[in-house]
Swiss-Prot record:
Family: Belongs to the LpoA family.
Subunit structure and binding partners: Interacts with PBP1a.
Protein name in the entry: Penicillin-binding protein activator LpoA
Lipidation (N-palmitoyl cysteine): C27
Signal peptide: 1-26
Topological relation to the membrane, as annotated: Lipid-anchor
Subcellular compartments: Cell outer membrane
Species of origin: Aliivibrio fischeri (strain ATCC 700601 / ES114) (Vibrio fischeri)
The keyword Secreted belongs to this UniProt entry's keyword annotation: no
Keywords: Cell outer membrane, Cell shape, Lipoprotein, Membrane, Palmitate, Peptidoglycan synthesis, Signal
Length: 603
């Protein structure tokens, strides 16, 4: 028995270090898994790697690894796997932080698939959730982006405002600029329909400023006063500290609305009828102006019956502050050469050379601008090979050059250009342009070589996908069927477009030219234009040409008040009767026209 004890003790001493060694070996080969993961970070491993780790865990840690796998799958654009992970996570008990990350990942996946509305429905954080600041920031940023992509600028601004508590001071100027960009992009109708909660004082202020700019844009002095008053009354609003540049520009304007205005137009002679129409439009707008100072004086002078020297004497005697006109190019040049006191001028034509050092701007119904806009319109419609068809002569060449230059600017390629002469030559010209004549000549040549008549049909060009025609309605009536006949069966016909020259207003020709899209002033493309009924009642027998001149006169009056803003505010736009007006570097008014389709009712 005595000999048994030492043996037992030695075995015990031997087993202890072996067990310890095995334990240490086990610890070194299988490191302890972390209690939690930082699931707010971007994934650093593949989705499959995270799934393998998740399968070895349970509870919250398993969910963490699955969420990281989900984020990795979305990053890899493996959406089938992402859907399976969503299904698996949906059966688990998730914390608010985990639910938030799952929503963010799901929304990002839907965003990448252009499912913006579904993505927004997915993002629905609860206000009571205790989350990391980074999660709230990502939530509001993502919702902002989704609202923008959905065209909902008001709600995009709401999300930006929610980011304010998380934004560093040196980044707040950028944040409020983004808010203003979203709110100020709302059109008149959208601003009128805005409904805000009483607690949304911040957003209410931005909407108020945008509304002032929209509703008072034609009354610069009132707008300036209103903006000043608002900023003084709301010193704690972000707009008072981070004032939008457009508002600063308006506040800096030295607005002096001229009280003595002269209208220089030909009221007799060759250009008398045009001058009278412009005059009527100008006075019409003046009478409609509720903001007009009762002391404003208008002096109308006939440039055909009065010498320019006499006119200058009258202007000085009457203390004229602003001149609208003349209408004729030579008279404009003569006025500018004698305008030693530099009276501000809005000329109603464009001289051959523009002197940017004098106090003059220019506004006219420019056919060259219309040609340039036609090029832009066709380009935006996706056409690649347009044909520009214009009448022979100086005008046709001038307009085709304007179209060609703009098309080259947009595409680095020149369009096809062709000119037509008399109506009797129209069909021959169309056949020539579309290659029918050359194709017919090749058929004759083949018949001669074969000494027999072969069965063959002339083939038309296939590359022309759009035709823009500078033509009267009477010419368009012939051009349309000639083009349709020239195109071989089975070939997609080119889309037909026309200038305002085609819009004569003659109802009898609408059937023949139905379907052709044309450009013109809004007053003639939109039957429901707010001023159309009133105009038709006052001038019921007006031709479309006379209506355009009347609209020119009305817009000229409005420009007298708005030119200071147009000069000071970048990208300023004015909705006029002749189109959307803006100003270029040479102080020439640029006119964006409207489009309509012959024979179709407008909205």
């Amino acid at each position: 028995m005595a000999n048994m004890t030492p043996r037992k003790n030695s075995v015990t001493r031997l087993i202890a270090p072996v067990a310890l060694a095995l334990t240490l070996a086990a610890c070194s080969s299988s490191p302890k898994a972390p209690d939690r993961l930082d699931i707010t970070q971007s994934p650093t491993e593949t989705s499959n790697a995270y799934i393998l780790k998740a399968d070895q865990q349970q509870g919250a840690l398993e969910a963490d690894f699955l969420i990281m796998a989900l984020k990795a799958a979305v990053q890899e654009q493996n959406f089938d796997l992402a859907d399976k992970l969503f299904t698996r996570l949906a059966t688990m008990q998730l914390s608010p932080a985990q639910t938030a990350e799952m929503q963010l990942a799901h929304a990002k996946m839907l965003k990448s698939q252009s499912q913006y509305e579904d993505a927004l429905k997915t993002l629905n954080f609860e206000a009571w959730w205790k989350l990391e600041n980074s999660q709230w920031v990502e939530y509001h940023k993502l919702r902002h982006e989704l609202y923008l992509l959905s065209g909902d600028n008001l709600n995009s601004a709401r999300e930006l405002i929610e980011l304010e508590p998380f934004t560093a001071e040196d980044q707040k100027a950028q944040l409020w600029t983004q808010v203003w960009t979203s709110v100020s992009s709302l059109n008149s109708t959208a601003l009128e329909e805005v409904k805000l909660d009483e607690t949304e004082t911040n957003l209410h202020g931005w909407v108020q400023l945008a509304t002032y700019l929209d509703t008072l844009k034609h009354s610069p002095m009132r707008l300036q006063e209103t903006l000043n008053e608002w900023l003084l009354a709301n010193p704690t609003h972000p707009a008072a500290t981070y004032t939008p540049q457009v508002i600063l520009d308006i506040l800096a304007l030295e607005i002096v609305r001229p009280e003595n205005v002269a209208l220089l137009l030909p009221l007799s002679g060759r250009f008398g009828p045009q001058g009278i129409r412009v005059r009527d439009g100008f006075i019409n707008a003046m009478m409609e102006d509720k903001e007009r100072d009762e002391f404003t004086k208008l002096k109308v002078i006939d440039t055909q019956a009065t010498s320019m020297a006499e006119i200058m004497t009258t202007l000085e005697k009457e203390q004229i502050q602003f001149v609208v006109g003349p209408l004729v190019r030579s008279k404009i040049e003569e006025f500018q050469s004698l305008n030693s006191t530099e009276i501000a001028q809005l000329a109603l034509n464009i001289p051959s050379e523009i002197d940017t050092d004098i106090n003059s701007c220019y506004f006219t119904l420019s056919p060259e601008q219309e040609a340039e806009q036609a090029a832009v319109h066709l380009f935006k419609q996706g056409f690649k090979h347009p044909l520009y068809l214009a009448p022979q002569g100086t005008m046709g060449e001038r307009l085709s050059q304007a179209f060609s230059d703009k098309w080259f600017q947009l595409t680095a390629k020149r369009p096809s250009i062709s000119y037509f002469g008399s109506k009797a030559q129209l069909q021959q010209k169309v056949n020539s342009v579309f290659g029918i004549e050359s194709s017919q000549a090749r058929i004759y040549q083949m018949n001669a070589l074969a000494s027999m008549e072969l069965e063959a049909q002339p083939r038309s060009r296939r590359d022309i996908d759009a035709v823009y025609m500078v033509a009267k309605s009477s010419e368009l009536v012939l051009l349309k069927p000639f083009i349709e006949v020239a195109i071989n069966p089975g070939i997609k016909p080119p889309k037909l477009y026309a200038s305002s020259r085609s819009n004569s207003g003659r109802q009898t020709q609408l059937v023949e030219i139905k379907g052709i899209e044309f450009s013109d002033i809004p007053l003639l493309t939109n039957e429901n234009h707010s001023f159309k009924a009133q105009y038709d009642e006052l001038w019921p027998k007006s031709s479309n040409g006379e209506t355009r001149l009347h609209a020119l006169g009305m817009d000229a009056y409005q420009l007298v008040a708005e030119l200071p803003q147009m000069k000071a505010v970048d990208n300023y736009r004015m909705e006029g009767k002749t189109g959307e007006l803006s100003l270029n570097q040479e102080c020439v008014i640029q006119r964006k026209m409207s489009w309509a389709v012959h024979g179709e009712e407008t909205e």
